[in-house]
Amino acid sequence: ITIVLGFFIARTITKPISDMRNQTLEMSKGNYTQRVKIYGNDEIGELALSFNNLSKRVQEAQANTESEKRRLDSVITHMSDGVLATDRRGRVRIINEMALKMLGLECADVEAKHILDILNIDDDYSLDDLQENNDSFIIDINSEEGIIARVNFSTIIQDTGFINGYIAVLHDVTEQHILENERREFVANVSHELRTPLTSMRSYIEALEEGAWRDPEVAPTFLNVTREETDRMIRLVNDLLQLSKMDSSSDQMNSELINFNMFINKIINRHEMSQGKNVTFIRDIPVKGLFVEIDPDKMTQVFDNVITNAIKYSQESHKRVEFHVKQNTLYNRMTIQIKDNGIGIPVNKVDKIFDRFYRVDKARARKMGGTGLGLAITKEIVEAHKGRIWASSKEGQGTSIYITLPCEVMEDEFGDWDA
């Protein structure tokens, strides 16, 4: 009897302890859902109850941790900045999609690789440098795509002072970098374009002050050059003001529906009359009316710019300007081609002619009185009309300027418009 009673008494003690041991093993595997059976209200029962409460709290804490982790993963995934997290040795453990996109890499390319190697800054920095330097810096992280990023590093440090890892945040500043370069280049160009005529005018005025005004042959020439340079500065300032208005969207568009055939023919007629027999104008324009919604004044400026350039750069012996207008009925758009028979443009410079202040031949352009802004303004106006402008050229074979605009063919109940 004593042995039997001893067995049952021992079992009432060992069974709950065995259950708690099994539950501890389950918890070590990450399973917090099971509970220990409570056999009584004695000390072992209270221990089992406390164990269950502990298990419940750990389960809740684990659930909160998982929830926070998912939330953090979601934030990192959808961030507009790139994020890389490393271990204490600098090996990448976490990288979001934006960082991969900015770096032009796949996940497999960065797995367990050193962050300094991935960012290609291992020659300039060490982990100790990043630890000591809290300032951000600019790096070219993807040369092929031309992506420039501002990188901010932070060190993950435990309460004990032990370094646990590093975090790098990549902010794409490519557009700001390009805009800043364009701004500097623009200011430099404006300064140069204003300084050149001012220097020339100053020289002539000083010569006149020193007595050149008494020379009946020299004085008129000096005054004429001064007037021409003044006119060029006025044109430059006016062009700059127009570009400024377009950039700030304060330039009002007064659009109206017009017959484009009549519109373009009127412009060509004006240039034909002013040029006389010096220039041959060839027209390939449909008779049926093509209607466009445009600002007539601004689009007149566009075609005047393009036609004037075509005349300027055509062959001196026999200037010829061709006009070809074609409609794409599928997309309700038309293409205007204005072609000259001039000196042409090198292939590597064709795409740059619409840049502000760009000139293929600077000396010749200045001699002809150009500001270097005409085609830039032309492009802004065309794009404001939901159109597109581009050029095609070969050296010695002339240049073609193409302009596409939205259009419609409207049936006129009174008959076709006479172009």
Swiss-Prot record:
Entry comment on modification after translation: Autophosphorylated.
Transmembrane segments: none
Subcellular location(s) per record: Cell membrane
Pfam families, per database record: HAMP (PF00672), HATPase_c (PF02518), HisKA (PF00512), PAS_9 (PF13426)
Annotated ranges, domain HAMP: 11-63
Main subcellular localisation: membrane
List of residues that carry Phosphohistidine: 192
Entry membrane topology: Multi-pass membrane protein
Function: Member of the two-component regulatory system WalK/WalR. WalK functions as a sensor protein kinase which is autophosphorylated at a histidine residue and transfers its phosphate group to WalR.
Protein name: Sensor protein kinase WalK
The encoding gene: walK
